[in-house]
Amino acid sequence: MATIYCTATSLDGYIADDDESLTWLFTTPGGAAPGSTAGADDESAPELHFDRFFAGVGSIVCGANTIEWVRRDLTKDGQPFVWPYSQPTWVVTHRDLDPVDGVEYFAGDIADLHPRLVEAAAGRDVWVVGGGDLAGQFADLGLLDRVWIHQCAVVLGYGRPLLPRRLRLHRRQLDTDGQFTAMLFDVVGPEPRDSA
């Protein structure tokens, strides 16, 4: 079991554009749609394929912007919003958001939430979906074990940063998957600033 920040990023380090859109990701050939498990059992899929990651997830945590993006961009033709994942999910927010089946809202301290995520994961991984600042809050408390990045062959020029923290990582694995470069890192700890 590990707590893993797994996300896709542009070549220039953005996880969403300034409009909170991920259209750039889902229009890239091979981009995994939320809730997809298409390649999880595909023996020919790269080891670091998104769908293989999804298969090991036991619980999910994300921020309010993430669930609002999913609600806005994945709700089709006036259909009711359905959270695309079956795993127990928490949304860290201080806003009043509409209830969503299968999603619990949390406005407390990440240190208090983490044990609940681990228990719900039942020996599987905790997926920190994002955004980057939420992943940073887990890292600040020493609760983030790994960073799993799928770097997409696109340059956005602006947007939401991948992980707005100074962290030292150790690369475990590197793989390619179509138009993506997949990288798995262990979190070593904070990267100190030069005192000079």
Where are these regions (language model features)?
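Enzymes that bind and transform nitrogen-containing heteroaromatic metabolites
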Residues: 1-196
